[in-house]
């Protein structure tokens, strides 16, 4: 580990104990070891004496790794777990009998709650026996699940290529192009599924001699049932009292099974985290059992070979523009210790990659997985996981929100609001630049927050719900294009798209907050001059932002970014036209904007199908289709504009149908809505009727059939 990035040791620390919060992903005593060596879940908040009721001499000196399963009936009637027994997931057993200390289902992800050897070297008072202790979870054997799909196997004498062909840098270089290959006719199943998606064992990006335990976090069904959260000035725990009388600067304090860690470098604005024990552990145990069952379904659905290809697609098309995980750490774990990855995160990555299935020549010959089923499983995972503080839960939620296709808008909003609440509980809305945590963790925390911010603003705009993040609710500094992690130099251009999307979302926040909050909408017609001034100011800012986007035409994610710029300008122009602000000027400007938007829409072709698109584009296409139809109806009897507006409508409709029949999912909603509206407008309008006949393959007015 890079010692230069490691924070200093706390001056005072509790008696050395094995670290349950490390398993939780909320360790702040070992945060220098935990966060810099594991970025699957670097919440890195807290760790102190996890066994306050256990004498130091009674800790086992010979147990080496495995822990018995815990059943719900082991919980006492008062909701606590027995201390000093092998059934308490928070207390290590003292028994030397190890006959029942076995992992009953080796394929299930397990979690280690002990610290790595590297961290123990930094705490010399901990004995070597304690250093060797590993605290693993065991689950009862689940019922076997029959796989729903059968995948081709390798021929005898041939082996699957493992995920060790390329380094992270080489992988990004190899897949720097996003050019799509057209789907060919069905070919016979391949004899082997070649893969080149993860790090080489001698990758220079990984510190020499590092083990998997040094480089990965132990996620998933970990043993800790504690809750981590940040203390605020209005919290029931008095921050000033704790800081002044119970805990030194950058120190720790433990009382009544609760652990506090002080991380603020500025005593005037203290920042502390607390970890409370679970008050209803029997419910958490039941939750873990349900999570286990869900992941068994995932493993039965996604074979290891197909899973490798899907992860390759994720890093090839999504991670480049949307880097919300630590790619290097994840790929290393995927290669060496896949069972230690977060099941919820892995499932979300699988589901989000299916949209690019046809871009992989090998996957074309395999039965296509049901994306909806994997998204449903991800949603089930999230529903069960939001009650525990995990960064992997946040990352999975963020990936879920950008997944395609969207099916349940209300469900997505529910996931989004819970993810925002969890991020605020864990302090992701605060400026961590002065915190005593590694630089890489600071970068990742900022990325996660801005990814949530982007999703919240655009979803709020498109579905018309008031934003839940206000301008005064966060202190996170803006993203910059130089905030790259190890091995990400080759995706710097694509990362700039993410930076620009966050910047555009800040502008959108101002528009929504000042023009479209509930009170402003109700009084808009009474304050037309003020509204006109605000719209003019925002249009100037949007033009300046657009000019600052020095992006290549074929840069991954750039087309989707420009579509969102068009969407925001269209919103502002529509609002001005609705208020009849100098009609002639705004009508002409509105027509110019629609022409430019249609021009960008017509530029979408098959080479863009594997580009990264924000899923909100589907709402924008619907808004654009409605704007074109309204403009045509407004100018239906205007000789100067009638031909122009009908030409726009005809071009948009034909291209929308063309994209739909090539399975470009982002136009499905616009296709259905456009078809329904044109059917309703075709009566008495020969031009519309002819357009409908030429572009759509049916002429029935039965709306139910047109929407199938």
UniProtKB/Swiss-Prot annotation:
Coiled coil: none annotated. Residues 24-53 bind DNA. GO terms for biological process: DNA-templated transcription; regulation of transcription by RNA polymerase II. CDD domains: fungal_TF_MHR. Residues 83-101 have a biased composition (Polar residues). InterPro entries: Carb_Metab_Trans_Reg (IPR050797), Transcription_factor_dom_fun (IPR007219). It is found in: Vacuole; Nucleus. Residues 56-101, 180-200 are annotated as: Disordered. Residues 58-72 have a biased composition (Low complexity). One of its GO terms (cellular component) is nucleus. One of its GO terms (molecular function) is DNA-binding transcription factor activity. Keywords: DNA-binding, Metal-binding, Nucleus, Transcription, Transcription regulation, Vacuole, Zinc. This is Uncharacterized transcriptional regulatory protein C105.03c.
């Amino acid at each position: 580990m890079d010692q230069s990035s490691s924070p200093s040791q706390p001056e005072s620390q509790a008696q050395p104990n094995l670290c349950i919060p490390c398993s939780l992903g909320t360790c702040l005593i070992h945060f220098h070891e935990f966060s810099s060596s594991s970025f699957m879940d670097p919440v890195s908040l807290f760790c102190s004496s996890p066994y306050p009721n256990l004498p130091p001499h009674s800790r086992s000196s010979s147990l080496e790794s495995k822990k018995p399963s815990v059943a719900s009936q082991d919980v006492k009637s008062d909701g606590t777990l027995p201390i000093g027994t092998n059934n308490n997931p928070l207390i290590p057993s003292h028994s030397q009998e190890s006959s029942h200390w076995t992992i009953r289902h080796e394929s299930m992800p397990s979690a280690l709650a002990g610290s790595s050897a590297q961290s123990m070297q930094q705490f010399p008072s901990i004995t070597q026996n304690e250093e060797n202790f590993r605290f693993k979870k065991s689950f009862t054997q689940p019922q076997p699940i029959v796989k729903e799909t059968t995948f081709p196997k390798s021929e005898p004498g041939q082996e699957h290529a493992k995920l060790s062909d390329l380094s992270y840098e080489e992988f990004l270089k190899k897949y720097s192009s996003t050019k799509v290959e057209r789907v060919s006719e069905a070919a016979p199943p391949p004899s082997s599924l070649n893969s080149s998606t993860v790090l080489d064992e001698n990758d220079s990006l990984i510190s020499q001699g590092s083990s998997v335990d040094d480089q990965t976090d132990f996620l998933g069904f970990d043993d800790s049932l504690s809750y981590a959260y940040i203390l605020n000035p209005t919290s029931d725990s008095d921050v000033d009292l704790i800081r002044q009388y119970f805990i030194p600067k950058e120190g720790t304090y433990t009382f009544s099974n609760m652990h506090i860690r002080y991380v603020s470098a500025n005593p005037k604005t203290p920042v502390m985290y607390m970890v409370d024990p679970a008050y209803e552990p029997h419910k958490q145990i039941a939750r873990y059992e349900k999570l286990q069952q869900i992941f068994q379904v995932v493993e039965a659905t996604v074979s290891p070979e197909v899973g490798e290809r899907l992860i390759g697609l994720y890093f090839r098309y999504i991670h480049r523009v949307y880097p919300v995980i630590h790619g290097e750490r994840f790929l290393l774990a995927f290669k060496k210790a896949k069972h230690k990855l977060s099941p919820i995160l892995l499932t979300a990555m699988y589901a989000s990659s299916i949209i690019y299935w046809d871009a992989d020549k090998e996957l074309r010959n395999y039965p296509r997985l049901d994306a909806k089923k994997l998204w449903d499983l991800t949603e089930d995972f999230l529903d069960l996981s939001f009650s525990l503080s995990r960064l992997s839960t946040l990352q999975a939620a963020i990936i879920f929100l950008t997944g395609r296709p969207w099916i349940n808008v209300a469900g997505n909003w529910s996931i989004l609001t819970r993810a925002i609440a969890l991020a605020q509980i864990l302090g992701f809305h605060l400026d961590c630049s002065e915190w005593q945590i590694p630089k890489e963790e600071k970068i990742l925390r900022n990325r996660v927050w801005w990814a949530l911010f982007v999703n919240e603003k655009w979803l709020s705009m498109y579905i018309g719900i008031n934003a839940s993040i206000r301008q005064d609710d966060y202190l996170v500094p803006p993203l910059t294009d130089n905030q790259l992690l190890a091995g990400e130099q080759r995706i710097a251009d694509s990362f700039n798209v993410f930076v620009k999307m966050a910047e555009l979302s800040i502008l959108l926040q101002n528009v929504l907050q000042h023009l479209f909050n509930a009170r402003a909408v109700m009084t808009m017609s009474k304050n037309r001059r003020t509204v006109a001034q605000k719209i003019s100011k925002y249009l100037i800012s949007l033009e300046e932002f657009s000019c600052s986007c020095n992006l290549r035409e074929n840069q991954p994610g750039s087309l989707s970014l420009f579509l969102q710029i068009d969407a925001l300008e269209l919103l502002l122009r529509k609002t001005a036209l609705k208020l009849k602000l100098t009609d002639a000027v705004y009508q002409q400007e509105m027509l110019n904007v629609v022409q430019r938007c249609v021009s960008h829409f017509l530029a979408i072709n098959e080479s863009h199908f594997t580009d990264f698109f924000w899923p909100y584009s589907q709402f924008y296409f619907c808004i654009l289709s409605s704007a074109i139809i309204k403009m045509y109806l407004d100018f239906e009897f205007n000789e100067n504009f009638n031909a122009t507006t009908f030409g726009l409508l005809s071009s948009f409709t034909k291209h929308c149908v063309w994209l739909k029949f090539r399975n470009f999912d982002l136009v499905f909603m616009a296709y259905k809505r456009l078809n329904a509206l044109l059917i309703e407008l075709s009566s008495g309008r020969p031009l519309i009727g002819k357009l409908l006949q030429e572009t759509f393959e049916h002429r029935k007015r039965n709306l139910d059939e047109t929407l199938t």
